Amino acid sequence: MMRPKWEHDRPGVALVLVLFVLLVVGAVSAAAALVGSNAWLINFYDDRQSVLEAVADAGLEEVRARINGAESALFPDSGYTTVENGVSVKNVAGATIPGVRRFTYVGPTGSTTGQYGVFGSIISIAQDRNGDRIIRRAEVTQESFARFAYFTDVEPVDIAFGSGDIIDGPVHSNDNIRIYDSGATFRGPVSTAGVVASGKNYATFQQGLEERAARIPLPKTAELDKLKGYAQLGNMAFTGSMTGGEDQATLRIEFIAIDLNGDGDTTDRNEGFIRVYYSNDPRWVVASVPSDYSTNGLRNSRNCGHYHEDKKANTRTFVSARDHPHPPKQQSDSWEASLNSHGRCYLGGSDSIFGEFVPDDGLGRWIPWPGPISPLVTATGRADSAYLFPISRDLNPNFRGVIYVDGKVAVSGVVRGHVTLAATGNIIIADDLKYATDPGSPNRDCTDADPANDDILGLFSGQDIVVADNTINTPTRPKASGSGNNYISFDDTPEETIHATILALNQFRVQNHASGPTNVEKCGTTQRGRGCLFLTGGVIQRTRGAVGTTNGTGYLKRYSYDGCVMYSPPPYFPTTGRFTRGRNFDIDPVGFDVAAFFDLLSSQ
């Protein structure tokens, strides 16, 4: 059987195949073109986004530069300021970037009271004609003067860094800096509005040196008026006087830390207090030598004396030099011998003079606390419960961290809490001024939210901050006449300790630094007249004051920087006016409203 034979149309099949290949190639080409187009669009979009991001970031820095310059008023006390409202933007070549507009705003955010510092935010919005937006936020913080380890407006030509000085923390001067050939090491950044006029090769700048930097003006006395208002809210504004010498005052503030909860320490946040003493006799208040010292020595001192012991009654009674001879010893009880044998001197009104707390001792009086007395204080059974001014929000809800004195004030004691003490007159360091938790203690942590073990004190004087030349700080001859080294230390320690950041619109200095003993108290292995001056904090002043001399009078400096002030400056402490960079953030542009944003992030 024969099968049929089919005829094949080969030209037709070839045509179909060619058409199919053309379709495939066309599809591939179209896909390639589409992919290329998409890639171009993506690249274009990315480039555009990069431009918007750069424009927004530049806006942040431009606003910060303006509020740090002549336009500081752009930063408001509350709300926000519109700095740019849809302005065109230029690139680095000076050409306008087509289709791009920028909106920038600045205002306070976070805690806006200023108690813990001045904080703010800058918002920068870059937008193109298509409505695409990039929104950036920068946190800024106004720089506190407390951040400086050392600051001067004017450097004396006869004082320089040297003798192996080691300075931790930031240093700035608005004047030329000089270095002696004995050398100095600066462990923090150093800046000067002038230059290092001499001795630069004798210095080590571990974090760099900036010469011809911008000048930083000291705060004005008007800053004191602001602090007065905050102090009045918490019953912490007091009236002193300008009576007495430069290192004498009629008003004395004593810091006290009290264990309220019986846990064996005084570091809890509600355990800080002050007592306030007033007298018409400034010599008595600060334990100066009597007015007739040149004739009679310490014979008539009410501050200096020694203890009489009654072994039968197991009591000790302080008897001043003025009250000698004292029964039952009578004539055998010499005032001079009493001072030479375990003599002590105390500030006016001290419990140690009277053996107990005396509200009114006839020479002066302790000022009563005008607010309610906490049951926690009453429970301690202290005789001075009604005279303790709480320096914590727990026991004094209106306390803003500020104590204010109109006039001069003498200070001493143990500080528990965050406090700024401001005075229109001199602030006199009458005795040791220490934190409840030593600044070098491993228990101290100023970076966490817990205020325990975290003490900070700022001293702000409209004039000088003076270490008193009194019978406590300075070894003194019982008799003014005489020669040789018959000086006696009537203090409980052979040095002076100050835990505080110091800001004086004139000077920080030691009264009569160039007189008195030269080798009575040791500072380490070195004999000095008054021993070591231990200061932990910073010194900010118009011009440098002296604390001692090379022949041994006064103190030997032992300064160290308190890094805690970088995180937690004293309340309402004056600021330099300069805003420093903080963190930057991206903000979702969907539904963003600038007014609502500043309202949300501002708190009282």
Per-segment meaning from a language model:
Residues 2-168, 172-175, 180, 185, ...:
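Beta-strand/loop motifs with alternating small/hydrophobic and polar/acidic residues, enriched
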Residues 95-103, 113-118, 145-419, 423-424, ...:
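C-terminal globular interaction/adhesion domains in large, modular proteins
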